[in-house]
Amino acid sequence: MADKALKVGIVGYGHLGQFLVEKIQSEGAEVGLQLAFVWNRNADKLKDSLPKDLILHDLSDFTQRDTDVIVEVCHPLIVKEFGVRFLSHAHFLVGSPSALSDGQLEQDLRTAAKQQGKTLYVPSGALWGGQDIQKMNDSGTLRALSIRMSKHPSCFRLTGGLLSDWTEGEGRRVLYRGSVAELCPLAPNNVNTMAAAAIAASKLGFHGVTGEIVSDTALADYHVVEVDVTGPDGFSVKTMRQNPAKLGAVTGKATYNSFWSSLLVCKGHGGRVYLC
């Protein structure tokens, strides 16, 4: 057990938030984590599973809690509204990195992290090889990056009714292919993997990384993420990740454990953005 437990604030109590809270409650003492607060838009959802003193009713009151790391697992709008403020108080693990497709917000968060000496953590989630992509980016050898995410249509949460007409057995349908910057607002809860890639590949950025989302009724048991990296002189790497997932699940099973592993890294890496 660590000498001093890191105090963690959890913002959001959906499937992932609940998983993290239960994990900290059951294993936190062993790994040096303890809950500072939990906030949910509907606080009634918290009262049967948490002590009253851990429930934060007004998110603006987070500054009144002694917190080392704030974890957002809620919605990109929370990142936009509170991200800079979070970084003035604690390290910030952003579970909705698609919010950073807003170029001004990304710059504001990077600036806040640098000025406050706090780390903006971006979880790699379902992205395989994120650290390698970041190394190529930093060394100037990354030429192109594209990511395809394929899921059963029930697993997408899209704006504008983009997939409202799907029928079981229709097969494969490409919903979008283009810049990740334009994709993020269409599928803010489904493209965090691509957002993490765009942050790792910061020289290409959200406008330079290509994203594709595919609806496929054959994918009843898995989410599939394919990453295609291009470097100089014909260098390329292609990976395919199959992540077990139930029908209707936005997040695959393996991503929960990946997120937990990311949280364990959040012990302070200076005033910068850090892929974990």
Curated annotation (Swiss-Prot):
GO function term, MF aspect, one: aspartate dehydrogenase activity
BP-aspect Gene Ontology terms: NAD biosynthetic process
Alphabetical list of Pfam families matching this protein: Asp_DH_C, NAD_binding_3
InterPro entries per the UniProt record, alphabetical: Asp/hSer_DH_NAD-bd, Asp_DH, L-Asp_DH, NAD(P)-bd_dom_sf
Similarity annotation: Belongs to the L-aspartate dehydrogenase family.
UniProt-listed PANTHER family: ASPARTATE DEHYDROGENASE DOMAIN-CONTAINING PROTEIN (PTHR31873:SF6), L-ASPARTATE DEHYDROGENASE-RELATED (PTHR31873)
Protein name, as recorded: Aspartate dehydrogenase domain-containing protein
